[in-house]
């Protein structure tokens, strides 16, 4: 009997690379795992609790924007997943990415979600916290390790009392900027043994993104908005097997393999 995963698409119908890359990763586990795709924002599609694994994607726009019909059932699902894991032996395994990570942080009250002073676009180092150095999904990664980051919003001002009450831990922080006075954003949180989220995009496939970003029209648009030096650095980092490739190979595959192992043990 195959395990079941729900892929929650928060891209609101916009063209993106995140969902195809997540589907490609999930397809690798087709011998033990089947998955369904849910168009959360554009289609108001929300999975029920019959799934074993829930992968929440990134997406565009303001994570604090209200009024969408999908939002109440979306936050209701997060609450139900948390309560399920408190009450049941057979756990639900959850991964939040970027936009959904920001929404989860807002839902749990673990930090302040705000507009970033400047859009983050490209590849950057992030630094592990003490707990991040103990995080199994980051075991194969150096400190700092490199991530793909594309966002206009951030999570800062962590609520340490709330984190402690939940048993949650901040795993890594934005790169150090000694010449700037901005607070470093939270880049990953382990909410519980079964629930984790990252501000960055661990699904970023470096080979696929290289092809995508090197198309002339796209290259010209990026250089115009973000500058040639940032574009060149991103291309170098995507091509370097010790940078984005290591994160891509480690984080989501590690999450899925751990979830499959734990769920398979529960089924015995």
Model feature map: region roles:
Residues 45-50, 105, 160-164:
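Short loop/helix-cap segments at secondary-structure boundaries that form the rim of catalytic
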Residues 108-207:
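Pocket-forming structural segment of enzyme catalytic cores
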Residues 59-60, 101, 152, 202:
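Active-site metal-binding loops of divalent metal-dependent hydrolases
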Residues 61-132:
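Cysteine-nucleophile active-site neighborhood
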Residues 1-85, 206-210, 216, 221-268:
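N-terminal beta1-alpha1 cap of cysteine-dependent amidohydrolase-like domains
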Residues 1, 87-91, 179-182:
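Short, solvent-exposed loop/turn segments that connect beta-strands within catalytic domains
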Residues 6-10, 97, 150:
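Short hydrophobic segments within beta-strands
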Residues 2-4, 93, 146:
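Residues that mark the start of a beta-strand
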């Amino acid at each position: 009997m195959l395990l079941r995963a729900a892929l929650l698409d928060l891209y609101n119908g916009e063209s993106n690379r995140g969902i195809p890359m997540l589907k490609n990763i999930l397809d690798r586990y087709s011998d033990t795992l089947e998955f369904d795709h849910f168009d959360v924002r554009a289609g108001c599609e929300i999975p029920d609790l019959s799934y074993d694994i829930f992968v929440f994607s990134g997406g565009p726009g303001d994570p604090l924007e209200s009024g969408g019909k999908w939002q109440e059932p979306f936050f209701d699902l997060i609450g139900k997943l948390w309560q399920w894991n408190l009450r049941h032996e057979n756990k639900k395994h959850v991964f939040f990415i970027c936009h959904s990570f920001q929404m989860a942080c807002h839902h749990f009250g673990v930090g302040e979600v705000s507009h970033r002073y400047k859009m983050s676009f490209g590849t950057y180092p992030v630094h592990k916290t003490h707990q991040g150095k103990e995080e199994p999904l980051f075991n194969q990664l150096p400190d700092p390790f490199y991530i793909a980051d594309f966002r206009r919003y951030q999570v800062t001002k962590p609520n340490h009392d709330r984190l402690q009450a939940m048993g949650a831990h901040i795993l890594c922080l934005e790169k150090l900027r000694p010449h700037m006075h901005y607070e470093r954003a939270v880049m990953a949180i382990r909410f519980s043994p079964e629930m984790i989220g990252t501000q960055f995009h661990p699904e970023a496939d470096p080979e696929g993104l290289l092809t995508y970003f090197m198309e002339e029209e796209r290259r010209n648009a990026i250089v115009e908005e973000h500058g040639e030096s940032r574009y060149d650095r991103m291309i170098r980092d995507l091509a370097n097997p010790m940078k984005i490739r290591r994160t891509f190979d480690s984080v989501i595959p590690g999450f899925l393999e751990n979830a499959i192992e734990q769920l398979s043990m529960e089924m015995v």
